[in-house]
Regions:
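Alpha-helix capping/helix-boundary segments
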Residues: 12-13, 34, 65, 89-90, ...
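Donor nucleotide-sugar recognition loop
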Residues: 80-83
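Acidic, PIN/NYN-like endoribonuclease modules and their adjacent C-terminal/linker elements
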Residues: 1-4, 91, 95-121
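Short, well-structured N-terminal submotif of metal-dependent ribonuclease cores
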Residues: 1-56
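A general structural signal for well-ordered alpha-helical segments in protein cores
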Residues: 35, 48, 66-69, 87
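Acidic catalytic patch
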Residues: 56-78
């Protein structure tokens, strides 16, 4: 089954920006957290933000994402397997929107697969 779109993690977004990766032929989204991580290192963050918003759908941190992240955080904490907060929010965005996540950090995000995360590629 072909994905109805994908959520792109910061690691892949950087590769796309550097010309090391091409966008797939399907709708591509980024989390607002990914947008922040990406533009904060740019010489002109305002211009980088505008360009990213022209190319990708930007998914905000809404109640659905925050609730999903909170539930997963408690489960990870109980097992002593917490991950970076930003990655948790990106993963929760992917899960709550039912979008596979394209990331270079598969080992890290694989902790979220049992919580409903699907990794792309």
């Amino acid at each position: 089954m072909k994905a109805r779109g994908i959520l792109i993690d910061t690691s892949v977004l950087i590769d796309i920006d550097r010309g090391k990766e091409d966008l797939p032929d399907l709708p591509c989204y980024i989390s607002i957290v990914t947008l922040y991580e990406f533009i904060r290192g740019k010489a002109d963050p305002i211009k980088a933000k505008a360009l990213a918003e022209d190319i990708f759908g930007v998914i905000p941190l809404d109640n659905k994402v925050i609730e999903e992240a909170s539930i997963i955080w408690r489960k990870l904490r109980s097992k002593g397997e917490l991950i970076d907060e930003r990655d948790l929010l990106i993963g929760a965005t992917s899960i709550s929107r039912m979008l596979p996540l394209w990331t270079r950090n598969k080992k890290h995000f694989s902790k979220l697969e049992e919580h409903g995360l699907t990794l792309w590629r």
